[in-house]
UniProtKB/Swiss-Prot annotation:
One Pfam entry name: CoV_nucleocap
Protein name: Nucleoprotein
Residue numbers bearing the Phosphoserine modification: 162, 170, 194, 390, 425
Summary of subunit composition and partner proteins: Homooligomer. Both monomeric and oligomeric forms interact with RNA. Interacts with protein M. Interacts with NSP3; this interaction serves to tether the genome to the newly translated replicase-transcriptase complex at a very early stage of infection.
Compartments reported by the entry: Virion; Host endoplasmic reticulum-Golgi intermediate compartment; Host Golgi apparatus
Similarity comment: Belongs to the betacoronavirus nucleocapsid protein family.
């Protein structure tokens, strides 16, 4: 008895037979379809049998097997496709845990030409196949194969192949890929069809596909108009948009005085308890100067606010809204409503007191203690007891510069020293010594040497 994904009861194995390469999927071009060029049209020709691994040509990109699930597309270069152990198997109704094993197959898609004439390679897309099915049906679980990543449920037996039927696209549509809660999707990848509108449009897409199947059967003998839409055209457009965004995103964003002022004003317009200080609106502008009642924040953290690299680890200690209301002592106090001329309004303050408890087993405990010790009561170690923001230097006008010049001109200059005073510090020559000895013998001291008693 074989299992059919998406059905509660197991069904019999179905055969895909000879089908046209375009299948019945209307909204998505899957990797198992031939990516045809715009000039290769099948209008007026009979349907060709599905290509296999031995019959597919080198031109184009063909995967000769139909996956039960939508693909996972890479949108960032240099990212590795991988899942943690026990994760990565898509969810499908009717498939027991013992059969949830298989591999993700990398489909290397074709390249396209951009409007400026450059050749762009579309990033690969990955498809899931159950163990014993798909392009590597004969491989053993865990074999080292280029472009294959093995995944399995923790309850699955990877020594035996899965008893899953192969998908017939004429009978079964591809299932949107979903994973068990807690599964971490590889970084740089997204699930096809996982947009915001995907859940709401599933029921509509099923009814539309049923109606389109009936119309296709009734008009199978009629000539179908040629489509002017190339396969993966949406992906080409998306790639162009991503390339454009990536180019623009690489340029540094310039913050002007006007934009910084707007950000600061936007923050200050919020209630005090909703403000988030940052570089544009530092801590003191949001909450006032540091002191006994607001005693946290060193000089660096006061400038950067929540942009400080050390702040995220402190945020781990912050209580949740539930812990704030249910784990604190709260007191509602009515405040004075202001001056006599101001309109009357009731002002209240919700006073709270509580504690945040942690111990040395907390991850990053030493770093947290270091940051706390540097910022608690840091205002006491600063000049004046509080952190005062130094005023901006004012530009000097021409008048102020002239006044400054006049002040310099009026400054009295000290009288220069006498020649003897200027020479006191230099070394004495033999002639100086002889003259000095003669002066001492005569008892006559020249002017300027009366105070030099040590000479």
């Amino acid at each position: 008895m074989s299992f059919v994904p998406g059905q509660e009861n197991a069904g019999s194995r179905s055969s895909s037979g000879n089908r046209a390469g375009n299948g019945i999927l209307k909204k998505t071009t899957w990797a198992d379809q031939t990516e045809r060029g715009p000039n290769n049209q099948n209008r007026g020709r009979r349907n060709q049998p599905k290509q296999t691994a031995t019959t597919q040509s080198n031109s184009g990109s063909v995967v000769p097997h139909y996956s039960w699930f939508s693909g996972i597309t890479q949108f960032q270069k240099g990212k590795e496709f991988q899942f943690a152990d026990g994760q990565g198997v898509p969810i499908a109704n009717g498939i027991p845990a013992s059969e949830q094993k298989g591999y993700w197959y990398r489909h290397n898609r074709r390249s396209f030409k951009t409007p400026d004439g450059q050749q762009k390679q579309l990033l690969p897309r990955w498809y899931f196949y159950y163990l014993g099915t798909g392009p590597h049906a004969g491989a053993t679980y865990g074999d080292s194969i280029e472009g294959v990543f093995w995944v399995a449920n923790s309850q699955a037996d990877t020594n035996t192949r899965s008893d899953i039927v192969e998908r017939d696209p004429s009978s079964h549509e591809a299932i949107p890929t979903r994973f068990a809660p807690g599964t971490v999707l590889p970084q740089g990848f997204y699930v096809e069809g996982s947009g915001r509108s995907a859940p709401a449009s599933r029921s509509g897409s099923r009814s539309q596909s049923r109606g389109s199947n009936n119309r296709a059967r009734s008009s199978s003998n009629q000539r179908q108009p040629a489509s002017t839409v190339k396969p993966d055209m949406a992906e080409e457009i998306a790639a162009l948009v991503l390339a454009k965004l990536g180019k623009d995103a690489g340029q540094p964003k310039q913050v002007t005085k006007q934009s910084a002022k707007e950000v600061r004003q936007k923050i200050l317009n919020k209630p005090r308890q909703k403000r988030t200080p940052n570089k544009q609106c530092p801590v003191q502008q949001c909450f006032g100067k540091r002191g006994p009642n607001q005693n946290f924040g060193g000089s660096e953290m006061l400038k950067l606010g929540t942009s400080d690299p050390q702040f995220p680890i402190l945020a781990e200690l912050a209580p949740t809204p539930g812990a704030f209301f249910f784990g604190s002592k709260l007191e509602l106090v009515k405040k004075n409503s202001g001056g006599v001329d101001e309109p009357t309004k009731d002002v209240y303050e919700l006073l709270y007191s509580g504690a945040i408890r942690f111990d040395s087993t907390l991850p990053g405990f030493e770093t947290i203690m270091k940051v706390l010790n540097e910022n608690l009561n840091a205002y006491q170690n600063q000049a004046g007891g509080v952190d005062v923001v130094s005023p901006k230097p004012q530009r000097k006008g021409r008048r102020q510069a002239q006044e400054k010049k006049d002040e310099v001109d009026n400054v009295s200059v000290a009288k220069p020293k006498s020649s003897v005073q200027r020479n006191v510090s230099r070394e004495l020559t033999p002639e100086d010594r002889s003259l000095l000895a003669q002066i001492l013998d005569d008892g006559v001291v020249p002017d300027g040497l009366e105070d030099d008693s040590n000479v």
